[in-house]
Amino acid sequence: MIHQYPGVIIKNNEEMPYPRVCAHRGFSAVAPESTMAAFGAAVAIGCEEVEMDLWQTADGVIVASHDTGLERVSDGTGDLKDHTFAQLRALDFGIKFSPEFEGTRIASFEEILNRYAGRVIMNLHLRHEEQGQDFLTGYIKKIVSLIEKYGDEKYCYFMASNIDTLRLLQRIAPQIERCAGEEDKKPCDYLLEKALETGCTKIQLFSPFFNRYREELGRDCVAYMVEKAHKCGVICNLCIADEPELTKDYLAKGVDTLLTNRAQLTQTLRNQYIRVNGIG
């Protein structure tokens, strides 16, 4: 593992116990989402995981950003994918969050690895699925090459919703774990079927779909999916767990990893759950 910032190496993705807290786009309640400040804040409070969305710039640099549009998160305009890395670095990715973060720059994936490889487990949401197989293959290989450069294979896992992307990941990088994400307008059971077909070790439930699933199943979908997944040896992530009562409910139903924008609150609730239930 090579990086210029010496520090503690944590347990890897196979060893780290559950339930875990995954800081969604970093600790995005206290710092601009998907920036080094947000990831650093998540690591500082001891989150086991951080989640990030990875895009490729016009000149081939892999960067972290949820939006492909620049307007919400920066002082720029247009599509991230149409800008070079230098053009993106000239933009301010902090000013719209708070004046205190003025001057915050977009982070490349290599910068993130250089600082945090081995210090936090990374849930890597792959994007660009609409750009075709050839592009996607090159994009994935570039990300895998960076992960291998920093020896972070056991501290990362890929999250993708498209079954063809999951198959491609299985072929290109079988050594890196995969997580199957949900797709709009697909039946509830399809998520686990897709995960098993593509050798995924995790699934990621998405709370905006829960009402539709509840109507489809006629019962609580979280308990149903967690039970089915665990019977197959599959880990369950859930996105998003921001509300305290819902978070407690998700933990009680056996959700393994909680993606959250309120990392410290969710961490407190998780720790209380562990103490009360004598876990660990």
Residue ranges and their predicted role:
Residues 1-280:
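Phosphate-group recognition and catalysis centered on beta-loop-alpha active-site segments
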